[in-house]
């Protein structure tokens, strides 16, 4: 398989965000998914970082744009811009720090306040490799996810456990939600078929929301270089 690059053509682009307290491992989850790297010297994110990875959905290539922001309160001013246009979110806590789990509902409230109500959310208990230091049991994560209608996985960015699965669960569910909405809107409008773009390859939606009706979601190889930094005033 040829290596991905940022410039590789894609059929669709959508945005997802990583949220949770500082130092829960958001940046390393992003680095593992986008570049298959783990940074032992990872430092707190300043402002916003985002990375890309191409995902095969049937015969289409979707470029997933994953955003990571600092968990510190002093960066809360970027909130509305950060969530705008997001179709999915990984809501992350550290299984070795009870406070990060206790703050999950605060982050979920903020997400639901600023993001689209149809945003797909996966609850992620990260650092599962640190079992001996666990403060949050796996069943607690499952119970919270069930009560809030979220998906749930425990991950280890260090050991690369369930990282791919967490992102692909989110991407697959985004496809289902958007496809169902397209079908419902077309039925309400009396349209026989979805509006097709210029090359006849897919359904046209606002930027970041173009998904086609297929049933297979697989990721390509991680990008060799995909991170970018930006800040909002």
UniProtKB/Swiss-Prot annotation:
Pfam families: Ras. Keywords: Cell membrane, GTP-binding, Lipoprotein, Membrane, Nucleotide-binding, Prenylation, Protein transport, Transport. InterPro entries: P-loop_NTPase, Rab_GTPases_membrane_traffic, Small_GTP-bd, Small_GTPase. GO terms for molecular function: GTP binding; GTPase activity. It is a lipid-anchor. PANTHER family: DRAB11-RELATED. Intracellular vesicle trafficking and protein transport. This is Ras-related protein RABA6a. It comes from Arabidopsis thaliana (Mouse-ear cress).
